Amino acid sequence: SAQALDKLVEDRKREGSKIRKIIIAKLNLIEKLVLKVKKIMPLAIKSHQDKIKAKFNAALIDVDQDRLKQEFLFFVQKGDVEEELDRLVAHTSELRRLLNKSEPVGKKIDFLMQEFNREANTLGSKSISINISKISVDLKVLIDQIREQIQNIE
């Protein structure tokens, strides 16, 4: 009947609204974690630089400053996660945009979550600090939680 169909549509809208709120709360946490990485990155780089210097000193190697700079630049490039952080910010903006659409977006969000996961994995693999590694794991947990929620939307 028309009433039953209207009720079903209304129930689905209400459920969609609840899921949207849950996803937005998770997105807010993702954004906070990204900001946290950006904030601790300079200290992590400095700490990593100090470790490299200490290793050279411990080995009692008389290394010229150019060689030390080359080694340091190599490790900084390996640990540079700015691109991944920028992409995570872009993905959060895109997900917010999709959540505000009235058309079905489940498949698009699912694809976007794969991109989120890729960035979180790269962040973890490039990590030069335990704190950044932990944040990477926290990001993956939040991404998984969002993916679970989108299984319930169209």
Summary of predicted features, one role per range:
Residues 1-154:
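N-terminal intrinsically disordered, cationic/polar leader segments
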